[in-house]
Design a protein with these regions (language model features):
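Conserved phosphate-binding elements of NTP-dependent enzyme cores
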Residues: 1-627
Length: 627
């Protein structure tokens, strides 16, 4: 053949190198399919210890290969994209599928809207593009425009997962469906609430029913019908306190929610503790050259011994700053003053902090034996109290006899757990009340020792509200119990197993342990060093009355000399802050900057997303002048 002859193949094979490619199939672009998954990591994008062992042994890999406590490294073969080399190199409109999936929903929506296709490509892609564009629009409407399309489901918050499910339903034409939503506004900035509520109302207009569990005031006011359950929590709740429209509840004196709607908490917007950054008396943390993830901040100041709220629209960089910059660098520098910084070029003022603690919503206690009484540290005092009774001393019982973790005093049948595990063969195991001790955890002899007519088993079954009065004469026990009451946990029992507590309950119990250390009631000397606390949305799951309690508790920590930094969207909390740091102006690549900072009143004067909603909020919550 002539030297300039070129050979082409109709069978997706290269005549020069011999490479043969399979026919393009939708499964080729799915990492859940063996056809599309990276052969090295089996479509996980990461290599864990279990996966490495399976590879060495030549075993098949399943979902159990991804354990939370294992070390993970990004798969070098696919670079974390999860796909095989063929799928990674197919381009459409100039982009590969990993490049498209790395976009946020907002970026992808813009890219798909502005595609320039020839007539043939448009004819082929029109139906698919219509579906893609509408689904991306739905994600934006429920406030998830900042999420990347490749985001792994386990990394999503509960609120984000719920809103993704909601977005998927917006694209259907179903009628007569009853949707149940549990706090869909979690993690949403108040500005974005309106979009979410509009999306919810669209579902109702299609002929569907929505039952929404919610504490957000705006959501409650937009509801067609409200059912108020109360009046308290635990055994003090469960009763219908009122139902009807907002006006019906506001006129109902028995409705706790109605009272809060009719008489909102007053806020002046003026902080309790003034912040003047040029005041030489004020100690501060100053970060310069912050560049973590989407953050691009020249300088950001956090006043110490103040209550600071970091706010901003979803995806603006709040968690990145508080966790990956502030918390991470303080933790490093408090261990080693010369430790390298991450995500920031310079940090000054860290020497004024004694310790840093993230009070998060992870479960407390390592096993089911942990309970509120053991976690806050009063169980030891309770055991000592029972060991000091005449009956215990006459029998020769010491404090260990009153521990359900010790065989000498624990029920021999359930080993001090109060529950027995019943194996169900092919079904999950079931826990049932122990018949021997009736759930009291102790053996009969130990339960015969009484203090004020109650056994130690009876004490563990007490609600905290009852226990406050019962132990009123014992300050070392009563004080932490009163603190638990103050943070709205009075309905918990002292012996409630820790795994049954919600994330919000666990977070508030952690706050109680810190308050118990600083002894802010004046009757005990402070024991804790200057601590900086970082909290991420502590108001999740709280009723409006409990939010007020929480705000007062956080202020008590600051009054005791600590620093509190809170990531929060709740406007009641923001209005009570000494200092607000507002990040934005949008989420993702359009965020990451300080758009406003100052007192609530100062931020409310700005035309930022937070400033606009805070201005309206303060106007609606002005204190009523007494005549």
């Amino acid at each position: 053949p002539a030297a300039d002859t070129a050979f082409y193949s109709l069978d997706r094979a290269c005549p020069k190198c011999g490479l043969s490619l399979p026919e393009l199939d939708p499964r080729l672009f799915s990492y859940n399919s063996e056809m599309g998954a990276c052969p090295k990591c089996s479509g996980y994008g990461i290599i864990t210890d279990a996966i490495r062992k399976a590879i060495r042994k030549g075993e098949a890999m399943g979902s159990e290969m991804h354990a939370a406590d294992e070390t993970e490294i990004v798969c070098r073969a696919c670079g974390g994209t999860r796909l095989n080399p063929i799928a990674r190199n197919v381009r459409w409109a100039g982009k590969t599928i990993p490049e498209v999936c790395a976009m946020t929903a907002q970026e992808a929506s813009s890219w798909f809207e502005n595609l320039e296709l020839d007539d043939r490509s448009r004819t082929i892609a029109d139906d698919a593009l219509l579906e893609i564009r509408s689904r991306l629009t739905f994600l934006t409407e429920v406030g998830l425009e900042y999420l990347t399309l490749e985001r792994s489901a386990p990394t999503l918050s509960g609120g984000e997962t719920q809103r993704i499910h909601l977005a998927s339903q917006l694209g259907t034409n179903l009628r007569g469906v009853c949707y149940v939503l549990d706090e869909p506004t979690i993690g949403l900035h108040p500005r974005d609430n309106a979009m979410l509520l509009s999306a919810i109302e669209r579902l109702t207009k299609k002929g569907n029913t929505l039952l929404v569990v919610e504490h957000d005031e705006e959501t409650i006011r937009r509801a067609d019908h409200i059912i108020d359950i109360g009046p308290g929590a635990g055994i003090r709740g469960g009763r219908l306190m009122g139902q009807g429209t907002v006006e019906d509840l506001e006129a109902n004196p028995d409705s706790p929610t109605g009272r809060m709607l009719a008489h909102p908490l007053p806020h002046t917007g003026t902080p309790q503790r003034r912040v003047k950054l040029n005041d030489p008396e004020l100690k501060t943390l100053v970060f310069r050259g912050v560049h973590a993830r989407n953050l691009q901040i020249d300088e950001i100041t956090v006043p110490l011994q103040r209550f600071t709220v970091v706010t901003g629209v979803s995806g603006s960089g709040k968690s990145t700053f508080c966790r990956e910059v502030l918390f991470e660098n303080l933790s490093r520098r408090l261990k080693d003053a010369q430790a390298p910084l991450v995500g920031t070029d310079q940090l000054t003022g860290f020497e004024n902090v004694g310790r840093v603690l993230e009070v998060d919503q992870t479960p407390i206690g390592k096993n089911s034996r942990s309970c509120p009484a053991t976690y806050v540290g009063i169980m030891t005092a309770i055991r000592d109290l029972y060991a000091a009774t005449n009956e215990a001393q006459a029998r020769g019982y010491d404090a260990s006899r009153f521990s359900f973790n010790k065989a000498v005093g624990a029920c021999p049948v359930c080993a001090g757990q109060g529950l027995r595990t019943v194996e169900m063969n092919f079904l999950p195991d079931v826990k049932v009340l122990c018949e021997a001790c009736a759930g009291k955890r102790f053996n009969p002899e130990t339960l015969e020792v009484l203090w004020r007519g109650k056994s130690i088993g009876d004490v563990l079954e007490m609600e905290i509200d009852e226990a406050v009065d019962f132990f009123a004469s014992m300050p070392s026990i009563a004080y932490p119990l009163k603190l638990m009451q103050d943070v709205g946990l009075g309905y918990l029992t002292l012996g409630q197993p820790s795994p049954t507590l919600s994330g919000g309950e666990a977070q508030r119990l952690k706050l109680v342990t810190e308050l118990a250390k600083v002894r802010t009631d004046g009757s005990f000397a402070a024991r804790a060093p200057h601590t900086l606390y970082v909290l991420d949305e502590p108001t999740v799951g709280l009723h409006m009355t409990d939010v007020d309690r929480l705000s007062k508790v956080l202020s008590r920590l600051v009054d005791a000399g600590s620093t509190v930094v809170v990531i929060e969207h709740n406007l009641d909390i923001a209005a009570d802050a000494d200092w607000i740091i507002d990040l934005g102006p949008e989420g993702g690549a359009k965020g990451g900057k300080v758009v406003a900072q100052g007192s609530p009143k100062m931020v409310a004067r700005k035309n930022t997303a937070t400033g606009i909603v805070l201005r309206a909020f303060l106007a609606e919550h002005k204190p009523v002048k007494s005549t």
